[in-house]
Amino acid sequence: MTEKPNHAEAMASTTAGDTGRASDAGRNEGQPDPRKASIETDADYAALDSTARAVLDFWFGEPGTTGFGQPSARWFKCDDAFDTTIRERFGATLAAARRGEHDSWQGTPLGALALIVVLDQFSRNTCRDAAQAFAADAKALEVARRLVESHGDRHLPTAEHRAFAYLPFEHAESLEAQRESVRLFEALARETGQTGRGSYVDYAHRHAVIIERFGRFPHRNIALGRVSTEEELAFLREPGSSF
């Protein structure tokens, strides 16, 4: 996701090879009856603000379609055409969300997720390699924290929906948020069986290690006008240091 080489690039390998993905039976173990979940999802989608619905349909696919809630390679790679599409379709939505004009979306779990996608993902797509890519991170984290505290994340329709609800924790330059990211992605991994290299939980741990070491993400330093330390510069020369 620029920093979209952020976690998002991380999951490209999972999308391509899907390491350790559980069987359908295992994936649903301990989960709600899928038929009931489908009915609930339809009702929740019907109640959404039309713009929030457009965001979710664009990012995760429409309910009932083959690709709904399935990993998408476009999430995780730098693609100028895809970024332009987001900028043209949702640039005004992002600006409004940053001003708090879509805070009412938080009334439902799906609405909160739509707001997170706009603030956390669309910012990165539309402002790659610039400080504005991270300008909405604090607000996205607030929304994600409320969603998790209310257990609303448990009502999201698929594992991919839940993963994007958790990414603001992973993107935060905060050790407390990183620990919560690891906790959330470990719980999700136990349910899905996705634990290998390139999985969400793998990248949650990698992000947390960097914050434990540096207290910030060194690969953001240039965009944010920060001076890198010698240790950070050495780290940035290592493979995989920028996700």
Stretches found by the model and what they are:
Residues T2-K4, E29-A130, F134-F243:
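Intrinsically disordered, low-complexity activation-like regions
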Residues A8-P32:
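N-terminal intrinsically disordered, low-complexity tails
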